[in-house]
Amino acid sequence: MKKAVVLLSGGMDSAAVIALAQEQGFAVYALSVRYGQRHTSELDAAARVAAAQGVVAHKVVDVDLRSIGGSALTDDIDVPDAGGDGIPVTYVPARNTIMLSLALGWAEVVGANDLFCGVNAVDYSGYPDCRPEFVRAFEVLANLATKAGVEGVGLRVHAPLQFLSKADIVREGVRLGVDFGLTVSCYRADADGRACGHCDACRLRAAGFSDAGVPDPTHYAILS
């Protein structure tokens, strides 16, 4: 069976991506990164999703981006309730580049020629590393920078959610049997994975379920 490394954050998008990769016949190797994120309960969610969706292996890699800083997700900076103009403070510098690089390294080790990630350019928060140009550029890099690429084995970077709305992602997940109740999206999620209901990630997630006409399985803290 062909193999793929899938980036798994523990959120709804990456859970849907695993299901889509499996539907395409890939044996999935899921990679999560403990990068110093304050909402560490997403890693607990990643473990739940990996187990529920039957991945071949789930690896958690430690890369502490707090030493670099520059993001409300790693630093002692308030997470805003809603997105504004420009690149938001929840952007983690070079995060997707770093994570895809780790996925690329593992792919070479396990003999996978395909990488999957859940970046989205429709209902997203304005992150530069979620754009189609970034995904295309990383695929070029992957084929230039690896033994497999130099030997003529084409490496592919898939972003199957890139042009889907959050509602579309919900519908695809439901079609494929994804249990979104296992996932955590909130930037302020507590230790039990309960969502704040106010941050940009919560807003986008809630709108996705509402627009799709699907009951929202998110576990919320008491909303004020």
Curated annotation (Swiss-Prot):
Its EC number is 6.3.4.20. GO terms for molecular function: ATP binding; ligase activity, forming carbon-nitrogen bonds; zinc ion binding. Zn(2+) binds at C186, C196, C199, C202. Binds 1 zinc ion per subunit. Keywords: ATP-binding, Ligase, Metal-binding, Nucleotide-binding, Queuosine biosynthesis, Zinc. One of its GO terms (biological process) is queuosine biosynthetic process. InterPro entries: QueC, Rossmann-like_a/b/a_fold. Pfam families: QueC. It catalyses: 7-carboxy-7-deazaguanine + NH4(+) + ATP = 7-cyano-7-deazaguanine + ADP + phosphate + H2O + H(+). Its cofactor is Zn(2+). It is an enzyme of class 6 (ligase). Pathway: Purine metabolism; 7-cyano-7-deazaguanine biosynthesis. The keyword ATP-binding applies. ATP binds at L8, S9, G10, G11, M12, D13, S14, A15, A16, V17, I18. The keyword Zinc applies. PANTHER family: 7-CYANO-7-DEAZAGUANINE SYNTHASE. Catalyzes the ATP-dependent conversion of 7-carboxy-7-deazaguanine (CDG) to 7-cyano-7-deazaguanine (preQ(0)). Belongs to the QueC family. NCBIfam families: 7-cyano-7-deazaguanine synthase QueC. This is 7-cyano-7-deazaguanine synthase. It comes from Xanthomonas euvesicatoria pv. vesicatoria (strain 85-10) (Xanthomonas campestris pv. vesicatoria). The lineage of its organism: Bacteria, Pseudomonadati, Pseudomonadota, Gammaproteobacteria, Lysobacterales. The gene is queC.
